[in-house]
């Protein structure tokens, strides 16, 4: 009976939610909310806390899907199958508890590099927490993403232009 209730798609477990999320504020001195781990921007945290589309307990199915995604993303096959010429950008706050304060990101980058992916850029934002796009220095983050995209899209366009040039006939 317990398993049937627990794994019902609409069941919401406060216990499971606490097990997953509760420790994320652990390294924050005097947190004001349970969501302070998301961002240093108090206005963003306040909006998050008051938004019913953000502030809710996952369903059992939601947690199952989250854990499935994490498992697949960390599967060695994923790293092996990644195209070796695929440019990757990793961005993270160095105070993000989900990424284990940079350790998880560095581990992931090393796994990609160990599987032959060479074109990887990593940016850690000082004192930023989990949601780097909602942090106090988000304009810097947006600029870094824009620069990275422009650089890689321009390089791709240049490669495609060279590939499409007609070969000149030998004289």
Model-identified regions with their sequence ranges:
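Catalytic active-site module of serine/aspartate enzymes centered on a nucleophile-bearing elbow/loop
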Residues: 115, 119-171
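Short, proline-enriched alpha-helix->beta-strand connector loops that line the catalytic pocket
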Residues: 82-88, 115-118
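Short beta-strand/loop motif that positions the catalytic acidic residue
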Residues: 90-92
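Acidic beta-to-alpha connecting loop that harbors the catalytic carboxylate
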Residues: 94-97, 128-129
